[in-house]
Amino acid sequence: MAKNVRVRYAPSPTGHLHIGGARTALFNYLFARHYGGKMVVRIEDTDIERNVEGGEESQLENLKWLGIDYDESIDKDGGYGPYRQTERLDIYRKYVNELLEQGHAYKCFCTPEELEREREEQRAAGIAAPQYSGKCRHLTPEQVAELEAQGKPYTIRLKVPEGKTYEVDDLVRGKVTFESKDIGDWVIVKANGIPTYNFAVVIDDHLMEISHVFRGEEHLSNTPKQLMVYEYFGWEPPQFAHMTLIVNEQRKKLSKRDESIIQFVSQYKELGYLPEAMFNFFALLGWSPEGEEEIFTKDELIRIFDVARLSKSPSMFDTKKLTWMNNQYIKKLDLDRLVELALPHLVKAGRLPADMSDEQRQWARDLIALYQEQMSYGAEIVSLSELFFKEEVEYEDEARQVLAEEQVPDVLSAFLANVRELEPFTADEIKAAIKAVQKSTGQKGKKLFMPIRAAVTGQTHGPELPFAIQLLGKQKVIERLERALHEKF
């Protein structure tokens, strides 16, 4: 990279951090860190009616949770602030006045009703993409002064140059061209005095010395408008990279109303997903490393990130893959951290009290350890461990079939006799008791283990049996064995 790399992620506080925004932030971050550059988080809060309370804090908090430790923002001044657009209105005003003075922009007094009428007339004439006619472009200074004196509200529009081709040399899509004739004179300042996105973003990116802009492909159509502003001021635009859409499993564009996918980072956090797994997963949404490996640490991703490997085709948000990936991380997780992740869900579900005794806390820790291999996310411990919290065992159909086999009464009777004598009631002692049953009954393998598992858990698959039996407790195991011996299957 010839110049200093400075990138930006510019969320609006109109909601919480969405998976699309998280992916954009992540690619900006990986690129900046790969080249030893800086990442700016700028808050684009000019759509005041749509801003939600706590939206700003939520965006920043979730970025930090993911491991995106940006360099500059509203909470980290890097000398390029303010980092909130509503605090930059005077800056925009200065540049708007410059364009007005140079004749590159003009005041437009057309009412919303007039503009709608224009659009309808153009549609009726078969024009698919209506544009502003530009009639206020030709007002004389006297006419403008008179309309202003009458207190008529106005917007400010940019004069679109005629007969120009705008070319974007995009890092993802290659060369993309736009014709100025397809773009009508567009509004740079709304009637309320607030600049529009396509104007403010150019001023900000230039003054903050942004070198590269990674953003979603829905912004591609904004690029020619932004290039016009760069051109009028004689500024060099940044290098653009428009990332492909994220689609759902039906290959449809992800919409915030799509209920088949959890869409906000905070929801994954609440469910007990790990930030390092989410970071890894988002990095593979529209970018692929060389080779087959899919599990990478943050530092590895920073080292191998290569813009040339950004995908040109839509990337599918595969929830099964995310769950699989999170499970890979959980398997390797330090038990203390896993307990921190999963235990609150058992409390929230009412399975355990909030103020646990040391004994209860140790039992919960052992329970969570028992399911470490199977658990895909923290909250899943509640459904996985259900059998430990039921008074009565519930038999699955497969368990009933196992318990109907002819050798079962012998196996269960022998095991029950051993369990009654067991002291201490530990996994090692339980393992020895199962071995003793093997000896006395001659049954082994599935014929031995399956009936015991089915009788005490109601299931045919599950965590390591001696440990599960230990955690169920001696009394509960005796009751369940007795019931299985008396019940008809």
Curated annotation (Swiss-Prot):
One of its GO terms (cellular component) is cytosol. Binds 1 zinc ion per subunit. Zn(2+) binds at residues 108, 110, 136, 138. Pfam families: Anticodon_2, tRNA-synt_1c. Its cofactor is Zn(2+). ATP binds at residue 256. It is found in: Cytoplasm. It catalyses: tRNA(Glu) + L-glutamate + ATP = L-glutamyl-tRNA(Glu) + AMP + diphosphate. Transmembrane segments: none annotated. Its main location: cytoplasm. The keyword Aminoacyl-tRNA synthetase applies. GO terms for biological process: glutamyl-tRNA aminoacylation. It is an enzyme of class 6 (ligase). A motif ('KMSKS' region) lies at residues 253-257. Its EC number is 6.1.1.17. The keyword Nucleotide-binding applies. A motif ('HIGH' region) lies at residues 11-21. GO terms for molecular function: ATP binding; glutamate-tRNA ligase activity; tRNA binding; zinc ion binding. Keywords: Aminoacyl-tRNA synthetase, ATP-binding, Cytoplasm, Ligase, Metal-binding, Nucleotide-binding, Protein biosynthesis, Zinc. HAMAP family: Glu_tRNA_synth_type1 (MF_00022). Belongs to the class-I aminoacyl-tRNA synthetase family. Glutamate--tRNA ligase type 1 subfamily. Catalyzes the attachment of glutamate to tRNA(Glu) in a two-step reaction: glutamate is first activated by ATP to form Glu-AMP and then transferred to the acceptor end of tRNA(Glu). Monomer. This is Glutamate--tRNA ligase. It comes from Geobacillus thermodenitrificans (strain NG80-2).
